[in-house]
A protein has these predicted regions:
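C-terminal recognition-helix end and immediately following basic linker
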Residues: 1-5, 17-48
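Conserved GTP-binding G-domain of TRAFAC-class P-loop NTPases and closely related GTPase folds
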Residues: 200-281
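Short cysteine-rich clusters marking metal-coordination/redox-active sites
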Residues: 9-11, 59
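Conserved P-loop NTPase motor cores
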Residues: 66-68, 77-102, 106-113, 117-234
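Short amphipathic alpha-helical segments embedded in low-complexity Lys/Glu-rich regions
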Residues: 26-29, 38-46, 114, 191-193, ...
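Pre-Walker A adenine-sensing motif
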Residues: 57-74
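Intrinsically disordered, low-complexity regulatory regions of eukaryotic transcription factors
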Residues: 46-59
Length: 281
């Protein structure tokens, strides 16, 4: 269980897997009476009944009600930005998403176009293992012809400078995404990359996956002030918790149809214990 009881507990036993152990821990370590333990146990009961977990790492974060699977599925067509420095885990995260594409998206994906700047041998493994994926070097000149009216995903890896300066990229994100049924996924090294169309691309991005970036934590702070102007502390606490482990990340779900209660998540893949950060109102 991911919930911490209470915030300042340094005892590993504070992370409990059943109500009996949690109750004993609160009584013996935190010296809580039966009445004092009751709200913690009531809160924990929600988690043990459901396969989705919510992290309540700070006093201003509280548990959310059980989630419906469709609530946390990526809504296609959409635009996704995966951000972080070299070796942070962006490429691995993207590959894992594509390998679980049927479970991760709201629609059946028929074609994946994977565009890269530098060839890597693992691209051959992806073409062998992932159905209907096509690898292309460089930024494609005619994007729509590659999909032939199929429901698809355009992935751009190590093409930050090219993609943010191309008119065709803006057309895909602002018009093609909706009218051509194409989702875009692009990997960048900072949240606000330079480029002719970077601001337009950023404003039309529905999901931002932010990895740990020791040299650019200001970028997350700016994003927090833009998307959550009255809750920047909540966002930064969530981000710091999500990236505390190697290759950790925080998903900013900014899709218009997403519930306000589940906009910050981590560990989102089918074999993970998904975590949702919820603000105390």
């Amino acid at each position: 269980m991911l919930t911490r009881y209470p915030k300042d507990c340094s005892v590993p036993g504070c992370l409990k897997t059943n109500l009996v152990k949690l109750s004993n821990h609160l009584a013996n370590v935190h010296f809580m009476s039966k009445e004092e333990r009751k709200p913690y146990l009531q809160e924990a009961r929600l988690f043990f009944k459901e396969y989705k977990n919510v992290n309540t790492l700070e006093s201003n974060l509280v548990p959310h009600q059980p989630l419906n699977v469709m609530e946390v599925t990526l809504k296609h067509p959409t635009n996704i930005q995966v951000c972080g420095p070299t070796f942070c885990g962006k490429s691995y995260w993207t590959e894992k998403l594509l390998r679980n594409v049927d479970e991760m998206f709201s629609e059946k994906i028929e074609k994946i176009v994977y565009c890269y700047g530098e060839f890597q041998p693992r691209f051959l493994d992806m073409e062998r293992d992932i159905h209907n994926i096509q690898s292309i070097e460089g930024f494609p000149e005619d994007i729509y012809s590659l999909f032939n009216n199929k429901v698809g995903i355009l992935v751009l890896v190590d093409l930050m400078n090219e993609s943010t300066s191309k008119d065709s990229m803006v057309n895909v994100i602002t018009r093609g995404c909706h009218h051509r049924n194409i989702s875009t996924l692009f990997l960048v090294q900072n949240l606000f990359p330079p480029g002719k169309h970077s601001r337009t691309i950023s404003l039309n991005t529905h999901y931002i996956v932010a990895f740990k970036h020791p040299r650019d934590s200001l970028g997350v702070s700016i994003l927090a002030r833009q998307a959550f102007p009255n809750a920047t502390k909540y966002v930064m606490e969530s981000y710091e918790d999500a990236v505390q482990n190697p290759y950790g990340y925080l998903v900013f779900d900014l899709h218009p149809s997403t519930s306000e209660k589940i906009r910050l998540r981590t560990s989102i893949f089918p074999d993970d214990q998904q975590v949702v950060y919820v603000r105390r109102i």
